[in-house]
From Swiss-Prot:
The lineage of its organism: Archaea, Methanobacteriati, Methanobacteriota, Archaeoglobi, Archaeoglobales. This is Piwi protein. Pfam families: Piwi (PF02171). GO terms for molecular function: DNA binding; metal ion binding; RNA binding. Residues 147-148 are annotated as: Binds target DNA. Belongs to the argonaute family. Short pAgo subfamily. Transmembrane segments: none annotated. Keywords: DNA-binding, Metal-binding, RNA-binding. A divalent metal cation binds at residues 159, 427. Residues 168-427 are annotated as: PIWI domain.
Length: 427
């Protein structure tokens, strides 16, 4: 019989004032935020937010503004915020950009922009302009008018508070277990020839500490830019956290990148060795390089006859180097009964490590548990994505970069822009 284990759960989110709330319970989380606030309230310079919209939406905008104002104060504990309105005349780039510039010139901490409908080229041109300028949040009138406004605003503000520099919640994990840092890295293709590399440093509690992306380069340049992007992200992280000792390091490699497995692993090992020599990580650092993959032929069932749903957090051993990990919650019908369906797991392959044989079994399960926990971290809303942030966040970046490039937006480059390097602008 195939070997498997279940991740020991009991995981909670930590929010403000040292309070904890259970994961996957939106009601309890919102209640906890109201009572105790987020884990970290953003530090604002102006206490001003710009709400940019067209006058034809005025009735709905009044409701929206009221909800944003009350929830920022009562749920997110950001007090004395003023929301200023800026009106654009027509849904064209120049008209909207002029109001964006006016808002920035008056001194605001962030911009919330309501568009009439989904216009892909306009959206990505505006989005890229704003990403390079100021924290922002987009909304669409057609969605605002057709959805539960309270639910929509609740989830939207999770993203916006994060972009402003706040931390809604973190994972309440054992500080003695897991990695000192996790690096989510890899590349994503823009087209058949070009790609860009990414690297993000995470704490084990799911917080992103630093991120870098490369310029768009050709596939033949992948390995060169993979190394340089990882080194940049670790340098940035260490410059900001000079006393942070890295004795346990894990690399989560993902993305649609060129198939050069051996060359890729060789470069990643070389990169770790160079980081050791430059004392960016401990000279005795214990590390593992993992391939995390959603696209594979495997499915997991609860039993051979598919009568039971596989438990969330099931770790299935395919070999000593490859595991499957189920991240999904069972789907419940309205009557509360479980709908039995096979689950598409995450494939985790250990392509390289420097663990001893005595450490191996323990460390494998520790990093698998860590991946499962990181799948419960998501600041795009109150529902977890069921994909570790080390993979999910780069996927979000990839979608933005690819579409900005496709639709002629402004190039996005976090290098030298501390706000983009340390805050999740891609949410």
């Amino acid at each position: 019989m195939m070997e498997y284990k279940i991740v020991e759960n009991g995981l909670t989110y930590r929010i403000g004032n040292g309070a904890s709330v259970p994961i996957s319970n939106t009601g309890e989380l919102i209640k906890g935020l109201r009572n105790y606030g987020p884990y970290e309230v953003p530090s604002l310079k102006y206490n001003q937010i710009a709400l940019i919209h067209n006058n034809q939406f005025s009735s709905l905008i009044n409701q929206l503004k009221s909800q944003i104002s009350s929830k920022i104060d009562e749920v997110w504990h950001i007090h004395n915020i003023n929301i200023s309105e800026f009106i654009y005349d027509s849904p064209h780039f120049d008209s909207i950009k002029s109001q964006v510039d006016n808002a920035i010139d008056t001194g605001v901490d962030g911009i919330m922009l309501v568009l009439p409908e989904y216009n892909t080229p306009l959206y990505y041109k505006l989005k890229s302009y704003l990403i390079n300028s100021i924290p922002s949040q987009f909304m669409r009138y057609d969605i605002l008018s057709n959805r539960n406004l309270t639910f929509y605003v609740d989830n939207l503000l999770v993203q916006f508070v994060s972009k402003l520099g706040g931390k809604p919640w973190i994972l309440n994990v054992d500080p003695e277990k897991g990695s000192d840092i996790i690096i989510g890295t890899g590349a994503t293709r823009i087209d058949n020839v070009n790609l860009f590399c990414f690297a993000m440093v995470f704490k084990k509690d799911g917080t992103m500490l630093w991120n870098e992306i490369s310029p768009i380069v050709t596939s033949s340049e992948y390995l060169t830019y993979l190394k340089s992007t990882i080194k940049k992200v670790v340098y940035g992280f260490k410059k900001s956290n000079p006393d942070w000792d890295v004795e346990k390091l894990t690399l989560h490699v993902s993305g649609k990148r060129p198939k050069m497995k051996d060359g890729e692993t060789k470069i990643l090992k070389e990169t770790v060795e160079e980081l050791k020599k430059q004392e960016m990580v401990s000279r005795d650092v214990k590390y593992a390089i993992l391939h995390l993959n959603e696209t594979h032929p495997f499915w997991v069932m609860g039993d051979p006859n598919n009568r039971f749903h596989p438990y969330e957090g099931t770790k299935v051993k395919l070999s000593s180097k490859r595991y499957l990990l189920t991240l999904l919650q069972p789907y419940l019908k309205r009557n509360g009964l479980e709908m039995v369906t096979p689950i598409k797991p995450l494939s985790v392959e250990i392509v390289s490590d420097n663990w001893t044989s005595e450490e191996y079994y323990h460390n494998v399960h520790e990093i698998l548990d860590e991946i499962y926990y990181l799948s419960k971290m998501n600041w795009r809303g109150f529902r977890s994505r069921n994909l570790p942030v080390t993979v999910n966040y780069p996927k979000l970046v990839a979608g933005i970069i690819a579409n900005v490039n496709r639709y002629g937006g402004y190039p996005i480059n976090p290098e030298g822009n501390r706000s983009l390097q340390t805050n999740p602008w891609f949410l």
